[in-house]
Curated annotation (Swiss-Prot):
GO terms for molecular function: rRNA binding; structural constituent of ribosome; transferase activity. Part of the 50S ribosomal subunit. Forms a bridge to the 30S subunit in the 70S ribosome. It comes from Metamycoplasma arthritidis (strain 158L3-1). This is Large ribosomal subunit protein uL2. GO terms for biological process: cytoplasmic translation. GO terms for cellular component: large ribosomal subunit. Belongs to the universal ribosomal protein uL2 family.
Length: 281
């Protein structure tokens, strides 16, 4: 999808960019039968207390029911539209099956309106088709990958993401995948995946440009701890601009921040990770 840049006729428009939706998406309204109401919580729990900071004030939207399981086997489906989804970075495609049922799926890179796709145990290796990992050849890029059979895809669903199949392990029960993060892990061979990479890969290149666009997305301002009072944050207080006065940065609740590993050391799925993801610098 092409990126559209704006002229700097105001400071907010300077360096702002956006995806060119009109040139790349079908100009259709969403399928009503696949929409559900999406209430806003503004980061509050059922007691009204803030549990997630910096959330609230987004535009009203509907949730699109996306088919992550792809369990309608051996029935041809035709891609009717490619649409924008406000709830995820990837685009979605409306597919109509031969029996008339309509479903939304994650739109892979290269999928066109009018194209035929299918799910099943033994289907062709082409973009948009869904089948078990054991039947996909080595070197193929896949997305919407299950971690447990019949669970529905949970890995590689965001814009531009994918995983590459490296082969089978010595037992044949597991398929070895390399994720975009660099992590190499084993997944049960019975789990399903969809062939191809997720589309809309330019999503990460968009420059928001001004705070108002983030407010429409439901992202509220983030105040620095050093700008607060000492009773509000461990970094707060002091006369003028002062250092934080601690050996390492802290969270608002006094825990160490930055560089602290947050993954549980005894997590059950650790046994399936062959190589950890690359450490960010």
């Amino acid at each position: 999808m092409a990126i559209k840049k704006f002229k700097a006729y105001t400071n907010g428009r300077r360096n702002m960019s956006s995806l060119d939706y009109q040139a790349n998406l079908s100009g259709h309204r969403p399928e009503k039968s696949l929409l559900v109401a999406l209430p806003t919580h503004s980061g509050r729990n059922n007691q009204g207390k803030i549990t997630t900071r910096h959330h609230g004030g987004r535009l009203k939207r509907f949730y699109r029911l996306v088919d992550f399981k792809r369990n309608k086997d051996d029935i041809l489906a035709t891609v009717k539209t490619i649409e924008y989804d406000p709830n995820r970075s990837a685009n979605i495609s409306l597919v109509v099956y031969a029996d008339g049922e309509k479903r939304y799926i994650i739109s892979p890179k290269g999928l066109k309106v009018g194209q035929k796709i299918i799910s099943g145990e033994q289907v062709d290796i082409q973009i948009g088709n869904s089948l078990p990992l054991k039947n996909i050849p080595e070197g193929t890029y896949v997305h919407n990958i299950e971690m447990q059979p019949k669970q529905g895809g949970v890995i590689a669903r965001s814009a531009g993401s994918s995983a590459q199949i490296l082969g089978k392990d010595e037992t044949g029960r597991y398929i070895i995948l390399r994720l975009k993060s660099g992590e190499v892990r084993k997944i049960l061979a019975l789990c399903r995946a969809t062939v191809g990479e997720v589309g809309n890969e330019e999503h990460s290149l968009v420059n928001i440009g001004k705070a108002g666009r983030n407010r429409l997305r439901g992202i509220r301002p983030t105040v620095r701890g050093s700008a607060m009072n000492p009773n509000d944050h461990p970094h707060g207080g002091g006369e003028g601009h002062q250092p934080i006065g601690r050996k390492s940065p802290m969270t608002p609740w006094g825990k160490k921040a930055l560089g602290v590993k947050t993954r549980k050391t005894k997590k059950a799925s650790n046994q399936f990770i062959i190589r950890r993801r690359k450490e960010s610098k």
